């Protein structure tokens, strides 16, 4: 069960597969929000804290296999610490938290990608986050072939998830689109469009809320 949204800040998350342009849009959105005079905390999962950086190194760069349930628990541990020490305090101060990946990533990557029970992964994530849901989740959607081409042009080395087979990434994308059937929280954006068009659509959705 989620906690009611009765906080002074605004919690925005960016989701989508690898190579869809989350970091680019996060940077543009941060610049726009700062221009409006809002205090912004830009962060990410995993890796938004010192502890999270260590967990990120394990889940993305450790050699060898990690059991799917162990992987899900590591992400949940990162989330619990990150929400308690970074996200909630910022929201309580009335700031905008702009975050690259959150619990929907766990449902898509560990639930669908790793073929775990998506409902259990979601409940684990909500427990770790004490029920905290974003005010808006921006899902950047892009077909896997284009996303992989973008990623390949920007990387010399793939992390553990990026290196998974195409079937894995197809399951992840399908899971994201299924999650986005929650229209009050999600904005689904066609990430094949020009960067500035995408940024304008995101700003339009936020107009009046910031």
Swiss-Prot record:
Sections of the chain in a coiled coil = none
Q: Got a GO cellular component term for this one?
A: cytosol
GO biological process, alphabetically ordered: dTDP biosynthetic process; dTTP biosynthetic process; dUDP biosynthetic process
By its UniProt entry, which InterPro entries does this protein fall under? Answer: P-loop_NTPase (IPR027417), Thymidylate_kin-like_dom (IPR039430), Thymidylate_kinase (IPR018094)
Where do the annotations place ATP binding? Answer: 16-23
Q: What class of enzyme is it?
A: transferase
Concerning CDD domains, the annotation shows: TMPK (cd01672)
State the name under which the record lists this protein.
Thymidylate kinase
Cysteines paired by S-S bonds? none
Q: What is its EC number?
A: 2.7.4.9
Q: Which family does it belong to?
A: Belongs to the thymidylate kinase family.
State the protein's purpose: Phosphorylation of dTMP to form dTDP in both de novo and salvage pathways of dTTP synthesis.
Q: Which reaction does it catalyse?
A: dTMP + ATP = dTDP + ADP
Which GO-annotated molecular functions does the record name? ATP binding; dTMP kinase activity
Q: Where is the signal peptide?
A: none
Query: Record's superkingdom?
Result: Bacteria
In the record, what lineage is assigned to the organism producing the protein?
Answer: Bacteria, Bacillati, Actinomycetota, Actinomycetes, Micrococcales
What is the species listed in this Swiss-Prot or TrEMBL entry?
Answer: Leifsonia xyli subsp. xyli (strain CTCB07)
The protein's UniProt keywords, in alphabetical order, are: ATP-binding, Kinase, Nucleotide biosynthesis, Nucleotide-binding, Transferase
